[in-house]
C-alpha cells in the first residue's frame, strides 16, 4: 500500500496530476504518486511475453536513476532515465490483493506463504532497458519451481533468488568490513554474481522489439483516453500506464 515511487527521466513531457516531486534535499531524481504501488499498473515485457505489472517501490529505482544521471557544470540534470519496477505476481497473489482492496485495506485475518502448493511456474527477474538502437534489451535470470526445488528442497523460485542475493551480499560484507553503508549498485557485481550464481537459475540476455504502443489493442478506439497517448515517443511514461491516464 506504499505509494508508487520511481526515478523520473528528463525526457518526460507529462507528469501525473497526483505526482509529488522531491525538490528540496538530495539528488531530486524521484517522484511519488499519491496512490498505492499495487494500484499503479504499467505495461512491460519479460522473455515469456508482455505483462502488466505493479510499480512496487524499491530502492534500485532511486539508486539506479541517480547513478545514471548526467549533470552539467551547474549541477542541473541534463540526462536521466525513468526507472521503476513492474512486478507481476502469481494469480493467487493478485487475487489476495483484490481481496485486500475489497476489505478497504484491512489486512486479512489469516496469511500464508505458498510453497508446496506450487505445481508449476517460473520467476523471470531482470532489467528491461528501453529506448536505444536495439529498441529493448532484457537481461536477468529465469528460475522454475522444479529447478528451485532441485537446488534447495522445499523452497520456491522467488525465495531462492532472493536468498541467493542475500548470501552473496553477506559474503561481501564479511570480506569488506570497512566499506560503510552501500547500496547494491555499489558492490562489485562480478564477485557478487558469482556467489549468487548457484541459486538464481538460467541467465538470459537478449534483445526485444517490444514497446508499449506496438501491441496495444484498444477496444474502443476514438473514445476514452487513447488521445492522451504520445504517439511521437513510445518511451513516455503515460504510454506505459494502464489504464491510459485521463
Regions found by a protein language model. Give the residues of each.
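C-terminal catalytic/substrate-binding lobe primarily of soluble NAD(P)-dependent oxidoreductases
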Residues: 1-246
Amino acid at each position: 500500500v506504499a505509494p508508487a515511487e520511481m526515478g523520473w527521466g528528463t525526457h518526460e513531457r507529462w507528469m501525473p496530476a497526483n505526482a509529488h516531486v522531491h525538490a528540496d534535499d538530495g539528488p531530486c531524481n524521484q517522484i511519488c504518486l499519491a496512490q498505492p504501488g499495487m494500484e499503479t499498473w504499467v505495461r512491460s515485457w519479460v522473455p515469456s511475453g508482455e505483462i502488466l505489472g505493479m510499480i512496487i517501490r524499491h530502492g534500485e529505482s532511486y539508486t539506479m536513476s541517480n547513478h545514471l544521471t548526467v549533470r552539467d557544470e551547474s549541477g542541473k540534470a541534463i540526462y536521466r532515465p525513468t526507472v521503476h519496477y513492474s512486478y507481476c505476481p502469481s494469480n493467487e497473489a493478485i487475487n489476495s490483493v483484490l481481496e485486500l482492496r475489497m476489505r478497504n485495506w484491512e489486512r486479512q485475518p489469516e496469511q500464508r506463504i505458498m510453497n508446496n502448493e506450487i505445481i508449476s511456474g517460473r520467476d523471470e527477474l531482470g532489467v528491461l532497458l528501453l529506448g536505444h538502437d536495439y529498441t529493448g534489451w532484457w537481461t536477468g535470470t529465469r528460475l522454475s519451481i522444479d529447478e528451485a526445488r532441485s537446488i534447495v528442497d522445499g523452497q520456491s523460485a522467488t525465495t531462492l533468488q532472493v536468498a541467493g542475493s542475500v548470501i552473496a551480499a553477506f559474503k561481501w560484507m564479511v570480506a569488506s568490513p570497512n566499506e560503510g553503508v552501500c547500496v547494491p549498485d555499489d558492490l562489485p557485481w562480478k564477485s557478487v554474481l558469482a556467489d549468487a550464481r548457484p541459486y538464481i537459475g538460467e541467465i538470459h540476455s537478449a534483445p526485444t522489439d517490444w514497446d508499449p504502443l506496438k501491441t496495444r489493442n484498444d477496444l474502443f478506439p476514438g473514445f476514452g483516453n487513447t488521445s492522451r497517448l504520445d504517439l511521437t515517443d513510445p518511451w513516455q511514461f503515460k504510454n506505459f500506464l494502464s489504464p491510459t491516464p485521463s
